[in-house]
Amino acid sequence: MKRTREKVKEKVMAALELPSAPAEELAAALREVKLHRLYADPDIAGLLRKRDEVRDVRELLDDADIFVALDRSFTDRITAIGARFDSRSDELYHTMLVHEQQLRSTCGLPTYEHFNTSIVVEFLDEGHYKNPLDFGASVDYAMSYFSLTLRSFLEAGERMSVHYDSAKFDAACLHLPLSGEWAIFHERRSIWEHGQARGTRHENVAVFDASGSELLSAFRVSLSRLRGVRQGESFNPMTHPAVAGSTRKLPIDGFRSNDEVKSAYMTTQQFYSEDLREEVRGARLCEWIRAYTVVKEIAKQHIASHPLIGQPATLLLHKTADFFLAEFVAAGIPVKSAGQILRRFTFNASSKDILDAPLIPFNGELVLVPTAAMLIEPAFSLESLLKSIRSGKDEPNHELQFIGPGFEKLTRRVLADAGIVARKVKHKNRDCDVAFVLEDDVLFLCECKGRFQTSDFRSYVELEAELGRDAAQQHRKTCDYFESHLAHVRDRLGLAPTWVPSRVMRVILTSAKLGRVRFNEDFYVIDENMFYAFFARKKLSMRPLSSRRRTFVHDPRLDGPITVDAFIAYMDDPPSISRTRMLLEERELHFELEGRMITFKDVECYGELLKEHKESAVWTFPGTTVHHYS
């Protein structure tokens, strides 16, 4: 990353040093300045100030000054809190206590009642919340900040004896107001850096408006769809046979609980895998699920065994690495796999949060924040954990290596179940993942891109860019080749030697949930949810969280035979996106900076959980599920 940034810096400096750089070249340089946060670099900032007679440069500098000052104000607040502790280890210990106390209070669990400070959890956009899921999304913001704070403590590398001190607990509580603000600031800065918010200033007020950004709206819709599906699955009544039928091989020693059954089911869906014994990062999928399950069980047992918290230290669980290793092995995980899992579960500088890596190294032991561990959903934590692990120089991209083949296979099965012949077409170095024909003479050539779900704005921007640029370029060459060499398509699909398509439709299909339909020149870019729902004739439905009863929404495009026109109409306006877009609302978030009011205007999706007869319910958008095809 540093090498890339240095290369970009050299290129940008060369462009800015030109006395009369072309407008397009200057605009490109300014985009790189924002994307790589080079505006905070003294060398780049100095060159920009020499060109401040240019309007775009001046506006960038004015905006950047605000973000740099806001970042500094947050850093100063964090530093001021840290000054009240004897060491970083001291601060880490008391911050973990505060976080556990906060989570217990939120979840209605036993707390230590003798703290001087009462913990109140508030978020900047609470006025918009419609249900607990909206609150939960903001808790994710807080968890991000807490994990960011942890990483800074761990990097200090200190080991010393620490003990509870009420004044230090009070000081650690000051991190809480920062939690949501810090994470929200980071996201708003990222939105601006990607050119999706324009700043305006008037006297002591600065406004950054991203409410009209289609890209931001798409990200919000994508994330809302993801939250809705995950929330819906977590309440989905499920039994052992339901999952046993969805996998070709059972996990180690069967299932320990219904919770593990759900985790196994959701893992098969997220990883497009029919075999939970597939290996990833040194352990099988079922072993990762079992290890997360064991950590949750240890956390639950710790909380249950302490109905009254007599001492603050009891809030946390301190154990050696050997303890957790032994627990994993006792649960049926081979020693070698258990060692790999323990290494990945240990929180470090690259960890995203403690839901993925729940074991925090502290003074030679591993500390578990029990209530946070209870919130772990193994399927989602494993996906997030894998995203945080960067592949080595000679290692294949895990998403491509692991998700891709299963995703392609299931896409072809969706079509086969609809009575449509679908095949992979290969010749020499050309490879079309899925080819099929509708109405006898309309050929569809599909490129499948297996990707993890995106949960932050930058990742979503990169996803859309990859699909619309890199994937399109690759698929264009593939389509051009096979359209010129139809014999290979005829052979794989069993078509007559003289068969010629009346037209060819090019489709890029991704496993990640999108927030809008993209039509890139001659390509449709859609996600598997839209594809599966159409060909499986699955209509949008709403299900109360407490039952299996569903209310279906009529969709004439899903009635009658499968036609080309109906499929195109569905791709143009999929209900999974159009319905979610109805939840978009504009909002304003405010920060104060040295007597100035900084306002961020954007959009957010609220209310994935709907109210029906006073009963919480969730929209159910059909999506490819492995158990349908086993």
Write out the residue ranges for each language-model feature.
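Mg2+/Mn2+-dependent nuclease catalytic core
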Residues: 451-485
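Catalytic metal-binding acidic patch
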Residues: 429-437
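Short, flexible loop/turn elements at secondary-structure junctions
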Residues: 419, 426, 438, 450, ...
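Hydrophobic anchor at the start of a short beta-strand
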Residues: 421-422, 443, 504
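A short acidic/basic microdomain associated with nuclease active sites
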Residues: 408-430
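Acidic, metal-dependent phosphodiester-chemistry machinery of nucleic-acid enzymes
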Residues: 1-401, 409, 417, 462, ...
